[in-house]
Design a protein with these regions (language model features):
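Glycine-rich, N-terminal phosphate-binding loop of Rossmann-like dinucleotide-binding domains
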Residues: 12, 168-169, 196
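Rossmann-fold NAD(P)-dependent oxidoreductase module
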Residues: 22, 120, 124, 195
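N-terminal Rossmann-like FAD-binding beta1-loop-alpha1 element of flavoenzymes
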Residues: 5-32
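N-terminal FAD cofactor-binding segment of flavoenzymes
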Residues: 45-86
Length: 203
């Protein structure tokens, strides 16, 4: 089976889904390819990742119709931040701002669980008529020519498109197959991230 689209997007995470949402109503036929099963896209499990979003990110998500799909009691404002350096007395302090992007603001940004962002993005994109989402199969091979990109899936299906977007994580196998390099640095540091409960109010 062969399917032709204007744009092929490998990876239906927040980046791939948001890209597709941006092109709603463009008339372009978009095919999203995601290795995870459909159930994972519909109800992503909590994966421990908390994403800090800026005011601009919030504006983009509002414009795309994603923001209002996130439970209000799971959007946590970041009001103040400090960066400590071991035993040093020096610290970076980011106080609560009074303005952000020319508007009154009462926080630095927002902390939202990654699975909530993924779920909201999928809910928006799944309703778009110009987007087809293929799930449960990965990419076996990628080919490009002057005219198009071709993706061969693990299930044998062949897809083609005028543009190919690799949104399959920072370790993108699609990028590697195309010979596109990346610049990564290992700083030999360890970071401890966890959720904490405390008796005092955040207010």
């Amino acid at each position: 089976m062969s399917l032709h689209s204007d744009i092929l997007v490998v990876g239906a995470g927040p980046a791939g889904l948001s890209f597709a949402a941006e092109l709603a109503g463009s008339g372009l036929k978009i095919t999203l390819i995601e290795k995870s099963p459909l159930e994972i896209l519909q109800n992503p499990p909590y994966d421990g990742r908390e994403i800090a979003l800026t005011h601009l990110s919030r504006e983009i998500m509002q414009r795309l119709g994603m923001w209002d799909l996130i439970p209000k009691d799971e959007i946590y404002p970041l009001r103040d931040a400090k960066v400590l350096n071991g035993q040093s007395d020096y610290q970076l302090h980011f106080p609560q701002p009074t303005q952000a992007r020319g508007e009154p603001a009462d926080c630095l940004g927002y902390l939202i669980s990654n699975h909530n962002i993924r779920k909201a993005a999928y809910e928006v994109v799944s309703k778009l008529e110009n987007v087809t989402i293929l799930t449960g199969t990965g990419v076996k091979e990628v080919k490009t020519s002057e005219d198009e990109a071709q993706v061969i899936l693990e299930n044998g299906e062949v897809l083609s498109g005028r543009l190919l977007l690799a949104a399959d994580s920072r370790f993108s196998q699609t990028r590697r197959q195309l010979g596109i390099s990346s610049d990564m640095h290992d700083y030999s540091r360890t970071m401890f991230v966890c959720r904490m409960k405390h008796t005092l109010s955040n207010q």
